[in-house]
Amino acid sequence: MRAPTTDLLGEPWTAETIHFPPDDEGAVVATLIHRRADQPTGRAVLHVHGFADYFFQTQYAEFWTARGYDFYAVDLRKCGRSLLPHQSPHFASDLRDYFPDLDAAWHRVTQRDGHHHVVLSAHSTGGLTGSLWADERQPGLAGMVLNAPWLDLHGSTLMRTLGTIAVERIGGRTPYRIVPRRVDGFYARSLHHEHEGEWEFDQELKPIMSFPVFAGWLRAVRRGHAQLQSGLDVGCPTLVLSSASTAWPQEMGDDVHQNDVVLDVEQIRRWSPALGRHVTYVGIPGARHDVTLSLPEPRAQVYDELGRWLTAYVDGDEH
């Protein structure tokens, strides 16, 4: 473990490198990013990113710190700040490979730093991984906020079934084989200020044309989907936010900015109740895949919904 240093986001953000035993590719690290609230607090949020992503959503973090929560984010092994030169980006053969990263982050947030009221926040694939971790570990979360969690593939039942069978075979035999897919870059372009968006992020850590999808990783995701769809109990109130609609545009335009162009939101709606016994789902009209990076009007609704949910189910439950 290295002492926290100033993060690539600059002051007041810090980053702490956490070392783990090497795997088949070599050395492994995760990175814990942190910003304190203005006043000392026992409340915190721990955020987990999605695929081909890393933590850069500072406006989202500022929502939490203004509410009196210390904010933490973890860049998981082989992702974002934690991607090392010898590694296959975002590769994991089992989503449980990420559990030590979350365990280490949780220990630092709670045992070391003394927070006793902690919300787990997660986006896209991170929402799947975080939910499986919460179900298995039962850490005593105060709440969980999932931003467009990846709970199933899109497409017909037949295509999802056939695809899963193929991925199971190929991913088991040749886990580092790259899965062919159509990548148009529309989504990342809609976000970045040098293209059609307003946000700033490192295009090496979050490439406009994404990262390769490895068969072993997709196999791990499909196994995670099956486990979630059999029913979880994350043990806390859960808010699921997504765009109200999905679109598969063929050109850059308004549809890219006003829909989820990555995941099928109908699958998010369908499977959200499988997360636990207390789940609230809200679809945000006009929102992007990462709802916190939406255009101003739907983004304002995101924060309104999140604030109301926290007031109703989470903030008042501190003890």
Residue ranges of each PLM-predicted region?
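Short beta-to-alpha linker loops that shape the active-site pocket of alpha/beta-hydrolase fold enzymes
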Residues: F51, D75-G80, W150, P285-R288
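Alpha/beta-hydrolase-fold enzymes
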Residues: T125, T129-V213
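Catalytic active-site module of serine/aspartate enzymes centered on a nucleophile-bearing elbow/loop
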Residues: H278-H319
